[in-house]
């Protein structure tokens, strides 16, 4: 069996510029990738940006610019972070790139063809700040009958 290792940072949201948490995660991931390479393991280290979602739409509206313009501006800052930190990533991927879109479509179609994706009904509450669906039992009911997540979203 080949001695291969794949590691990736989270794909960072571009609703804002990078902060210390992004740097920390990137450095930790880079450390592991470098250690694996020094140990003789064929290692692929990827990072990049997620350029979809309500957070990005809202941030673009708040800055009076188009979402893709915000993505272009902030994704460049994340790419710059990889250079400033001297990260050893093999690639930087944006979810708005054609290669990512084509790959995601290909994977989706394969999952559909295999019957791994199906229509169903789901009930829950969506938290934009957490980008997560919650069951009502997982929420905290407020005095005004609204709900909060444990993170406050």
Regions found by a protein language model. Name each.
Residues 1-153:
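N-terminal, positively charged nucleic-acid-binding surface of large information/translation enzymes
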């Amino acid at each position: 069996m080949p001695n291969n290792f794949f590691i990736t940072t989270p794909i960072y949201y571009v609703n804002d510029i990078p902060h210390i948490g992004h740097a920390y995660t990137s450095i930790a991931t880079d450390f592991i990738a470098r250690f694996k390479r020094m140990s003789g393991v064929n290692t692929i280290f990827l990072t990049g940006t997620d350029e979809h979602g309500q957070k990005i739409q809202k941030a673009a509206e708040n800055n009076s610019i188009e979402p893709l313009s915000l993505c272009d501006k902030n994704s460049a800052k994340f790419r710059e972070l990889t250079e400033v930190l001297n990260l050893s990533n093999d690639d930087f991927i944006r979810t708005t790139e054609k290669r990512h879109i084509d790959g995601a479509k290909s994977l989706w179609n394969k999952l559909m063809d295999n019957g791994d994706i199906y229509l169903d009904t789901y009930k829950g509450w969506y938290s934009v700040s957490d980008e997560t669906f919650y069951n009502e039992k997982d929420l905290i009911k407020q005095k005004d009958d609204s709900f909060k997540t444990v993170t406050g979203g």
